[in-house]
Amino acid sequence: MPAGATLPVLDHELADDELQWMKSVYADFSKARAAAGLEFNPKEALRAILARAEYRLSASPDLTGPGPWRLGQNRHGRGVAAVFLPKVELHTHIASRTDQFPMYVMGEAEGFSIDEDGKPLLTPVVDGGHFHNAPGAPHAFLPKVGVPKPDNWEIAFIAITPRNLKEDTHRVSDEVRALYKQVVRQDAPLGV
């Protein structure tokens, strides 16, 4: 049994102020992108926005380096991190709900998940969107299926989580890997 199976399940709804915080961060990010034109550096713009006083958290994330920027915490005690993935990470959090808010994609992306009927699902990633992953739900962001992947492919998102996910991140089952291959048409990455 995976270690995360012994953790208490944390499945919450985000509070209105958490959702509003995300909407405001994304709105300011969109304004910065529109104003910068071709000179736009999305990671630096996001770093500058998250450093603003109006977006300060109870515990501010470490915004140094290339990311991920972790260790932020909001007034509800939930973790806030900015994550930058240049590759697919298919995994699950057995005991933790996660909320992911895509900020930008270099290229195009889809979110892999499994619906209530156990069928694999690919959902287009839209900047400013919201992906909710219930405890135990396998998930991954990946380059859009059938579209050539640019060399600089990357997805950036802000995650709001109930705990440090290092203690609750697990590989998916062989069955999930087979479902991934069914819709993506390539082998699933080995995972975490």
Where are these predicted regions, by residue range?
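Structured binding elements
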Residues: P102
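Short acidic-glycine-tyrosine-enriched beta hairpin
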Residues: D115-G136
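A short, N-terminal "cap"/entry segment at the start of jelly-roll beta-barrel domains
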Residues: M1-V80, Q186-V192
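Histidine-centered metal-chelating micro-motifs
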Residues: V88-H91, E110, G129-P148, L165-K166
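Double-stranded beta-helix
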Residues: A140-V192
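Conserved short histidine dyad/triad with adjacent acidic residue
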Residues: V80-R97
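Short glycine/proline-enriched turns and hinge-like loops at secondary-structure junctions
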Residues: I94-S96, E116, V145
